[in-house]
A protein has these predicted regions:
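Single conserved hydrophobic/aromatic residue that forms the stacking wall/gate
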Residues: 1-15
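Helix-coil boundary and interhelical linker segments in multi-pass alpha-helical membrane proteins
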Residues: 27-36, 94-115, 146-152, 185-197
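Short, non-helical or kinked segments that cap or interrupt transmembrane helices
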Residues: 58-67, 129-142, 169-177
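Interfacial segments of multi-pass membrane proteins
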Residues: 74-78, 100-104, 123, 137-167, ...
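Cytosolic, membrane-interface loops and tails of multi-pass inner-membrane proteins
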Residues: 50-82, 134, 214-229
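Multi-pass membrane catalytic core of lipid/isoprenoid biosynthesis enzymes
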Residues: 75-101, 130
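Loop-to-transmembrane alpha-helix initiation sites
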Residues: 154, 170-178, 189-201
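N-terminal signal-anchor transmembrane alpha helix
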Residues: 30-56
Length: 229
């Protein structure tokens, strides 16, 4: 009887532990999903559409390349408008993270920005309200890298900016930025969700700039900053 009681108690403890672990996993998935959705919703707020509409009365899709991003607005509307787009795209990533922290104050800023920022990239690139026709995600991705990985993210962005200044090719610098983060994130975090997110961000950047990369390969890409000698 004592042995049976001990076995029963052990099974009961195991069941309780299993239940606790499963509940924690479910809660973890829920909070991550909420942060991703929150980031996505803020990401869909394309600053360029509001700035261009206010400045010209036109839809951003009818301006230049039609891309709702800083480079297109700055080139075809003006520097002031381009800076406003830049500021707005940075701000929406920050605000999404702050709201995420208010919802989950027990989580670290790293975890909060990892998911809200990652969601913002998808929202910016593929907003449902524009049938998936969003921006190319350079500013949003840079902001996400800096807020999530700190100095590492900033260094990647600086090097990417230098690539643009030296070559004049914005698509090349854009792809270099997240690609540079891959080996360092792997070294620091190993095979982690951080590495998966950076890999996906790099693939997204390649997809969004594939036409520009193609033109670079075939010598057809114009010099965006005209600094190439």
């Amino acid at each position: 009887e004592i042995a049976s009681c001990l076995v029963g108690s052990e099974m009961c403890i195991r069941d309780r532990c299993y239940t606790v672990i499963e509940n924690k996993r479910k809660m973890c998935m829920i909070y991550k999903s909420i942060l991703l959705i929150l980031g996505y919703l803020y990401g869909t707020m394309l600053t360029a559409t509001f700035v261009v509409k206010h400045s010209t009365g036109n839809d951003v899709s009818k301006i230049g390349s039609g891309n709702p991003g800083m480079a297109n607005v700055m080139e075809h509307i003006g520097k002031k408008e381009g800076v406003l787009v830049l500021a707005g795209d940075i701000l929406k990533v920050i605000v999404a993270g702050i709201l995420g922290r208010l919802l989950f104050p027990d989580k670290t800023w790293h975890d909060i920005f990892l998911y809200t920022g990652f969601g913002a990239i998808f929202g910016h690139n593929y907003p449902l309200w524009r049938k998936g026709k969003g921006g190319k995600g350079v500013t949003v991705t840079c902001t996400w890298l800096i807020l999530t990985f700190g100095v590492l993210g900033a260094i990647c962005c600086i090097i990417g900016g230098m690539v643009v200044l030296l070559t004049g090719w914005l698509p090349l610098g854009a792809v270099v930025i997240p690609a540079l983060a891959i080996p360092t994130v792997y070294f620091i975090h190993g095979k982690s969700i951080e590495l998966v997110c950076v890999l996906i961000a790099t693939v997204l950047m390649l997809i969004r700039h594939r036409k520009g990369i193609y033109r670079i390969i075939h010598g057809e890409e114009p010099l965006h900053l005209k600094l190439k000698r």
